[in-house]
From Swiss-Prot:
<dbReference type="InterPro" id="IPR014722">
    <property type="entry name" value="Rib_uL2_dom2"/>
</dbReference>
<keyword id="KW-0689">Ribosomal protein</keyword>
<comment type="function">
    <text>One of the proteins that surrounds the polypeptide exit tunnel on the outside of the subunit.</text>
</comment>
<dbReference type="InterPro" id="IPR003256">
    <property type="entry name" value="Ribosomal_uL24"/>
</dbReference>
<feature type="region of interest" description="Disordered">
    <location>
        <begin position="51"/>
        <end position="73"/>
    </location>
</feature>
<keyword id="KW-0694">RNA-binding</keyword>
<comment type="subunit">
    <text>Part of the 50S ribosomal subunit.</text>
</comment>
<dbReference type="InterPro" id="IPR005824">
    <property type="entry name" value="KOW"/>
</dbReference>
<dbReference type="Pfam" id="PF17136">
    <property type="entry name" value="ribosomal_L24"/>
</dbReference>
<dbReference type="Pfam" id="PF00467">
    <property type="entry name" value="KOW"/>
</dbReference>
<comment type="function">
    <text>One of two assembly initiator proteins, it binds directly to the 5'-end of the 23S rRNA, where it nucleates assembly of the 50S subunit.</text>
</comment>
<keyword id="KW-0699">rRNA-binding</keyword>
<comment type="similarity">
    <text>Belongs to the universal ribosomal protein uL24 family.</text>
</comment>
<dbReference type="InterPro" id="IPR005825">
    <property type="entry name" value="Ribosomal_uL24_CS"/>
</dbReference>
<dbReference type="GO" id="GO:0003735">
    <property type="term" value="F:structural constituent of ribosome"/>
</dbReference>
<dbReference type="GO" id="GO:0019843">
    <property type="term" value="F:rRNA binding"/>
</dbReference>
<keyword id="KW-0687">Ribonucleoprotein</keyword>
């Protein structure tokens, strides 16, 4: 599906928990018709301990949302 929304565009979220937010697009996933928007749909993800990060812990990461839930701002 062809989309007018590209990476680094400013978009407004029009549906979901983050409705009304204006933020930058971090990535566009054309195969699934989804976008990743900065600071929207943030989840807490557990990280297992590794050699680089011996304590493990949690990180906050943006999840993709459907492209129909955003419009260009």
């Amino acid at each position: 599906m062809k989309s007018e929304i590209k990476k680094n565009d400013m978009v407004k979220v029009i549906a979901g928990d983050d409705k009304g937010k204006v933020a930058k697009v971090l990535a566009v996933l054309p195969k699934t018709s989804q976008v990743i928007v900065e600071g929207c749909k943030v989840v807490k993800k557990a990280i297992k301990p590794t050699d680089d990060n011996p304590k493990g812990g949690f990180i906050h990461k943006e999840k993709p949302m459907h492209i129909s839930n955003v419009k260009k701002a």
